[in-house]
């Protein structure tokens, strides 16, 4: 059975009836993390909300006043996951998030168009595709697509859009002679009922369960951004369709305007200016590294030159790295001196190094790490790692001063 959303992809609401409602759980992504949410699985007599399938994400919307968080297909049914229960046999008005739906329609029909043209022009078969949040990707069964080929595909795609080519939805049975003639990547194992064909008049006929525009003019435009290396002997073609092209142009213009202000030159000079900046930064970083190494040596030699230098050396610097700390330890020497060195923000996080006689470092390294709320490891008289509570540095110094006072360290 085709759902109402498949029979009329432009319908934004539907009056229907709740068939069943059962407690359920679902893993939903929030901020990059998946959390298990308790709710209810609702079946309706029919639905205007598209369940995920055919490479197209599911719709969002409302059943009455209850938000629909997911729609998935289970066999012939569309299962709506909601947070609040709904009474069976109740008449409800189902509404969709039209902006999300129409965006998916534009990308999906755009994929059919690009796929058909790539195949007819160059024999590039589509093996899969992904409708992403920002861009869509078509995986082509070819190791290489040239710039000239991309331009030709894009040109014909936009020509078909300007020609207002109609898009028809037809239903056929699996025993229909046409079944073996249309483009398809196969039916799901649990498919039941008639097979849905999306027919771009004179361009393509393809088996598909997704929602599509009724005319290519509704795509507005297609922009192929380029390609990326895909799986073995595959190429990923990246494209935008419809409103996404306009949003991309807007973002690109705003980025260009910001760069013009920051770089103090015109768009045609941005690449050269950034290249010069990168080279300057690289040179400065190299010079800074040399100066830090020299500073590490001078700091260590200054300590060694003091007659009353003692058996403990402690230093904190905001700037530096592990190499800076290890140079100091190497120059001072760790056989007769205990060193506690830290790099980073005094109140938050950074790096630390405890170096000295192996017995002391092995015993107190983990304790220092614990006080600093850090992670680290040690061997051969050195224990180093990352600290999350650099503000506890003074507590470590007190501990190590006590250690020095209670342990004999032979000093030259």
Swiss-Prot record:
Name of the protein in its database record: Alanyl-tRNA editing protein Aarsd1-A
Cofactor binding notes: Binds 1 zinc ion per subunit.
One GO-annotated biological process of the protein: alanyl-tRNA aminoacylation
Subcellular location: Cytoplasm
Entry similarity comment: Belongs to the class-II aminoacyl-tRNA synthetase family. Alax-L subfamily.
Keyword check for Protein biosynthesis: yes
Keywords from the named record: Cytoplasm, Metal-binding, Protein biosynthesis, Zinc
Entry superkingdom: Eukaryota
Pfam families cross-referenced by the UniProt entry: tRNA_SAD
Organism in which the protein naturally occurs: Xenopus laevis
Amino-acid positions noted as binding Zn(2+) in the UniProt annotation, renumbered to this chain: 108, 112, 208, 212
Cofactor(s) required, per the database record: Zn(2+)
Keyword Cytoplasm found: yes
PANTHER family: ALANYL-TRNA EDITING PROTEIN, ALANYL-TRNA EDITING PROTEIN AARSD1
InterPro entries tied to this protein: Ala-tRNA-synth_IIc_core, Alanyl-tRNA_Editing_Enzymes, Thr/Ala-tRNA-synth_IIc_edit, Transl_B-barrel_sf, tRNA_SAD
Organism phylogeny: Eukaryota, Metazoa, Chordata, Craniata, Vertebrata
GO molecular function, one term: alanine-tRNA ligase activity
Function, as annotated: Functions in trans to edit the amino acid moiety from incorrectly charged tRNA(Ala).
GO cellular component, as recorded: cytoplasm
Main location: cytoplasm
